């Protein structure tokens, strides 16, 4: 029985040499995707371009670019400027703010009109899960328990069914840390997300 697809993700602000080495190694080990995030002012697309130059087959994901701080035109420009390979790109977007559903729907439509690549939507709440199932090629879960992930997956499938197409592929971040301070780093990250209202709910 074949194993499930596995991805490897890094903080986009880490040193480029680390991105290069990890991207090469992930591809050599058979990982199916290599991801970076897009935190604050750190450009995830630029970090992903570093990985793209070191690899030939592995899918390349950015998860996710917040549409309330970077609009579709800026994202399109970034993808083109960095010459990201569209056949391998997993372009992740999301929005946690009020008006998120409309912003994500419009953003996905604009990106789809401008790029022939796979679009991934970050989904947490039930309405966003259903919307992601309707409009996206992939859905990214973050900081979910297995039970919450199963319920969210059902909502994604329901959205896809209403739209009349197959469900998108599901992705999930599973965080880990190594070293003597690993537990402390994970606890700090969990506390940071717990302070975000959408996750606290």
Labelled PLM ranges:
Residues 1-201:
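Active-site-adjacent structural elements that line small-molecule/cofactor binding pockets in enzymes
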């Amino acid at each position: 029985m074949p194993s499930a697809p596995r991805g490897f993700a890094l903080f986009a602000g880490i040193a480029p040499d680390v991105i290069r080495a990890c991207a090469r190694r992930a591809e050599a080990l058979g990982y199916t995707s290599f991801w970076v995030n897009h935190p604050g002012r750190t450009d995830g697309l630029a970090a992903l371009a570093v990985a793209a130059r070191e690899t030939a087959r592995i899918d390349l994901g950015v998860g996710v670019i917040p549409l309330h701080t970077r609009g579709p035109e800026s994202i399109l420009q970034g993808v083109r400027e960095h010459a990201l390979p569209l056949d391998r790109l997993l372009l992740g977007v999301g929005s946690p703010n009020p008006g998120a559903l409309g912003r994500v729907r419009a953003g996905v439509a604009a990106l789809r009109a401008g790029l022939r690549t796979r679009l991934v939507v970050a989904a947490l709440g039930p309405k966003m899960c259903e919307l992601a199932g309707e409009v996206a090629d992939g859905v990214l879960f973050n900081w979910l328990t297995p039970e919450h992930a199963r319920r969210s997956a059902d909502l994604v499938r329901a959205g896809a069914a209403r739209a009349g197409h197959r469900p998108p592929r599901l992705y999930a971040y599973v965080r880990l840390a190594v070293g003597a301070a690993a537990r402390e780093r994970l606890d700090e990250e969990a506390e940071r997300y717990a302070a975000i209202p959408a996750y606290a709910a």
